[in-house]
Every structure is written in structure tokens, then in C-alpha cells.
Amino acid sequence: MTNMKFGLGLCVVFLTLLTGNRAVEAEQIQPQHFLIHMKTSLAEDDAQICAGPNVAWALVKAGHQVTILVDASAVTSVTKGFGWFGRLVHSDTTALDLARLPERERVSLAEQMGVSLEEIPHQYGEYLGFLKEMGVTIYGNQTMMLLYNIDFDDVAPEVTPIALNRMVELFQSADRIIVY
């Protein structure tokens, strides 16, 4: 009986050591560089471009470095007064400036991020500025901007236009790439 208790005790100690080491390993996750590649404009699919900022915030909160690359048709969503009608009516705002975060999303973000509702942005354009203040770097594909005939001065101030070679560097240096 004593040998059985001793054996059982050793098993418990061994399992405790194993699970204890796993818990320590899980806590020591190294920060990574995430590149969020946002390619779909607000006009094409609002769910995709609007999900990117939420993921960016969650990654920053988890201690990761985050870069957002606005590409393809999404460059139109960060351009002031894009389109013929926009130039006449909203020449000083972007599509993201005009897109409000639904109240239920704001409430959910406040709960998930552990902040007050007052700290949550009201529009997606404001959200980009909020992320930039948190250390997120935001770039835009200047070649796509040229193809859409976008003047760099009309791009949201949070977005820095970059050339293709710089984009290649972003893709090569990222530990993980998330595409929206």
C-alpha cells in the first residue's frame, strides 16, 4: 500500500511539473509583428474593412506590433471626397469618416477591451487615429492610389502612402499576415 501511495504521489508531482511548465510556456509568448492587409473597400463589403481595426486593437492589447496596409479598392475608403459625388458633398471626409461604429459594436468593444464606452471611437475614420495613437503603423499602396487617380494630399492623415518595394519589405518582415 505504501508503494502504491508513493507511486501515486510521484505521478501527481510529475503531472504538476508538466502542467506547470506548460502554463509558464503559454505566458511567455513572444510578441510578433502582424501585418493586416486591408484590400476591400467599404463600398464593396463593409464587414471586411471594419473588422480589421478590431483585430488590430486586440493584437496591440496582447502586446504585438501591428501594421495595417490599405491596398486595392480599400484605398478609396481612406481618401477624402473620393468619387464625383463625394467631391461635391463630402470633400473633406473619407468613407471611413462617415461610417459609424454601430452602438452594439462599441458596447462589445468596451466590454472586451476593458475600457469605458466613452473611450470607444464613434466612426471608423476616428478608429484609425485611435489605433495610430496606440502605435499601429498604417500604410497605403501608392500605386493603387495612382490607379484610382487619388491625390496623396487627399489620403487620410493616418495613412502613409508607400511604394511597392516598401510593401514587399512589409510582407517579408511580418511574422503573420491577416487579410481583409
Spans of model-derived segments:
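Bacterial N-terminal signal peptides that target proteins for export
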Residues: 1-10
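Bacterial N-terminal signal peptides
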Residues: 9-19
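Boundary at the C-terminal end of the N-terminal hydrophobic targeting segment
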Residues: 23-26
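Short internal beta-strands
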Residues: 66-72, 139-142
